[in-house]
Amino acid sequence: GLITRFHERQSPESIYFRFFSPRPRLSERELEHFTRVDHRDRVAFVALLDDELVGVARYERYEGTDTAEVAFFVDDRHHGRGLATVMLEYLAAAARENGITRFRATTLPNNRKMLKVFASAGYEVASQLDDGIIDLAFDLRPTDDVTAAVDRRERLAEAASVRRMLEPATVALIDAGAGGPRSTTDPGRRPVPIEDGCLVRLAERLRDGAFPGSVTLGGPAALDELPEGVDLVVVAGPAAALPEVLDRCADRAAGAVVVLSEADASQTEAILEVVRRRGLRLLGPGSLGVCNTDPAVALDALCVEARPLPGTIGVLSESGEVVSSVLDHARRVGLGISTLVSTAEPADLNVADLLSYWADDDRTRAVLLHLGSAPLPSRFVRAARAASRTRTVAALASTARVAGGRPSPEQRRDRAMLRQSGVIPVASLQELFAIGRLLADQPPPGGRGVAVVGASRAAVDLAVDACAAAGLDPVTGHVGPAPDSLAAAASDPTVRSVVVIDTTPGPLPPTDLVDAVLGFSSDHPELTVVISAVGSERPARLVDDATGVAVPLFTFPEHAGNALGRLATAREWRSTARVYGDETPSGLDVDATRALVERWRADGGPDQVLELDASRQEQLLAACGLRVADRREVRTVEQAVAAAEEIGWPVALKARRRDRRKRTALSGVALDVAGADDLSATWARMEEALGPEGMQPVVVQRMVEQGLDVAVRIRRPDRIGTVEVGLGGPMAAFDPWELGVLPLALPDASMLVAASSVARALTDPLTRVPVVSLVHRLAALVDAVEEIHEVRADPVIVAGPVAWITDVRILIGSPRGELPVRHLG
């Protein structure tokens, strides 16, 4: 079978490294051993390429322990692609889910490839040489190094997949409804009927645009004549024929396939089945194509009339209808594009993949995203944060609403993902283009200080107000001739950008003003310079042909001020991201928390969700530097009185089944219980209302000083964890909690609290510090330990400099969400 053929294809050296002895064939006993798994103590993953096995990874638990032996065997033809490392990720995740905390492996000293697998995975490997054999062992807990290594490999693989699509050496244009080959680089070959006119136009555009690679135009049969490893295949034709064409693309090891044709839901699913089974990367269905204006690439595979100008702005649109308008407007305003991708509704390649590519693309200074209604992928936050740390990313997202005018949960989550990733959210294409135009010609502002200069006091004052409304700090407004007012603005060290106001009539600014502004921008490259014509229709930019210096021109000062303000905010995000990054809060012992949760999970089955009792809650919270207000669990009135005497009166009495929104004995929560008699009477009323099952166990808790009730809930329903903050206790039912996502850095926690109802009650930012710290710590805890499904702290009493957790619910279980599909690039 598969394993036998796989084994017999490998070199004697590879077989020796795997089995420590020559073994040209596997025995029946060995085959039976290698194919027997129980999905718990014996687990194996295989990698398939078409119908052939190209890799095997397996673990086998040492009986009665939480340690397993791990082994890999990768096809000789696929060494060096990272396959073993990716399979180790899957094995480790499966092992952790099954209660295995440690892997061991044995290898020969000269098997450097296997040693490299463990090192590149980020694990701290202990090794020992014994009798010519290296014994390796490492802990499976996902440390920061392991997580960082996984993220790094994922981003590199994503970028590599996109690179073959946007920087191809070979392109095939395939009409799924035609047959036969025709090479545009060999005009002597007999042409065949090509029904799709767009493909013919693409072939002509690639030829006319000096694409340096080879281009083949034809039907599906043309794929059979292509050399293996064609970089980009663009397909159009009947949707029903697409799965077969994609299979042929996979036969030729195509790097990426762009599907121009529309497809309904069932047809898209059939297409995706081939993509997943064959390991293809797909753009579409319904894409309008891609382009790369780098002269060395010269890829224009867009099915629209307009052609992009070369430049430094990356563009992604999830709406095919918008692409043509985007290109038309970009040409009209002189906006140069580095790469443009039309994804339609992304089925495979998506915004996260593109951001991973743009994060390392030297030609791209800024990225403009037009996002449709599809939910953002789980990888978006990490990919966008990586890109936003080095360049500006702005996004126009769908504003569709559900009935009642409220955003859906998915939309709330997507907005949080945009906010926390450093992406600039905009509300219109005009705002999106304003940011792109500014960054295409000028550096982003180095701060919020702005000087406004012009010849009209009224116009300057209007622009000063517009800049202030955009969140900028107008340093001064200079009125006078351009050279003098510009010189005055440059002399102020707090000025980071300059807005020049032109109120002269006519289709063009005065020559002396143009010369002064362009000369000033050339002499002060550290400043961001823009010009506003105060309502007059003028050219979109001023350009000095001799020096290449360009200054964007905006119709209204509000447009210029708004773009500058948003870019200043993005700069501040980058600064805080460099300082804080995704660092773990001080006092959070990640290893200790993971060890605790793994030990407790052993009490239940692999699919069971456990609710932690009070003692375990306190242990877990203590490991992350948090404490619950002093409390005791009791089962009798006598124990409750004794606990209250120990804690100190007055106390709160809480039944197991309690309504946090109400605070009466009948609802299971009684406050300010002042003595033994009061406690006994309260206990009796509570037990009568709830019954014995609703009572036990009962919590006796010290009363904390009065303050604001806050609620924090962190959940991991799938691969995207959410963080909610709002008012707690009785007010929780009336307060729409503010939403964030994991990972949540300290600045993100601060912004989340500031955007919630908590900030309206705690108006002084200093009084929010304990809430921000608590939210940050709880979010870091859940993000670090994927077995924690939910933490709900409600109410948290904020009194002065302290945030007291008075009630908490914690659920743990197997990690949620399927392992993501990984691509090797």
What is the role of each PLM region?
Residues 1-163, 168, 525:
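Long, contiguous binding/interaction regions
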Residues 145-825:
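Catalytic-core regions of core metabolic enzymes
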